[in-house]
């Protein structure tokens, strides 16, 4: 799993929720206006034909159950290898208090990339509290087996955990006088 951002990163860590083979990314990010949110990046292994989905399902369930900084503003994204209407993904959303920004916008099938018009929405995006999705689109084929799911996200600066004054920002070397 790779992680890149233009935003300020207050913290980032990879956690093996169920297996070291399927880590989950947890990061606390800061928008340009200072508003903070936690990011959960998830990509559980897909079950092979005839295999149980238990490992994948456990990874999805555990990923949304915690956020290291305990912020209420959360963006959960990734290739869940699961559809949003499955029991597992529906449970993830329900128990974590997440909203699906696709509601009222369409299913946004991303797999398989070459036949997405008859495909499955395996790539997920969920938000909660002050995190909002302003725009959601399927990107052009970039040579992957999935099409990119592109979201323009904002964080309500008035939300409980926005911290626009930077009270909870980690100290930088410049702030420490180094």
Please report, for each region that a protein language model flagged, where it lies by residue:
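Soluble catalytic domains of enzymes that build or remodel membrane lipids, polysaccharides, and related
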Residues: 1-178
């Amino acid at each position: 799993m790779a992680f890149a951002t233009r935003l300020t990163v207050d913290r980032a860590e990879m956690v093996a929720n169920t297996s070291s083979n399927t880590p989950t990314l947890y990061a606390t990010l800061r928008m340009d206006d200072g508003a903070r949110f936690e990011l959960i990046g998830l990509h559980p292994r897909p079950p092979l034909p005839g295999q149980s989905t238990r490992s994948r399902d456990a990874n999805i369930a555990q990923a949304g159950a915690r956020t290291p900084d305990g912020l209420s503003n959360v963006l959960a994204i990734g290739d869940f290898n699961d559809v949003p209407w499955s029991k597992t993904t529906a449970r993830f959303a329900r128990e974590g208090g997440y909203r699906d920004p696709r509601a009222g916008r369409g299913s946004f099938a991303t797999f398989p990339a070459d036949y997405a018009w008859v495909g499955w929405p395996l790539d997920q995006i969920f938000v909660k509290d002050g995190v909002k999705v302003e725009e959601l689109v399927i990107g052009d084929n970039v040579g992957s087996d999935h099409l990119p799911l592109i979201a323009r996200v904002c964080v309500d600066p008035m939300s409980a955990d926005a911290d626009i004054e930077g009270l909870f920002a980690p100290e930088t070397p410049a702030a420490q006088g180094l």
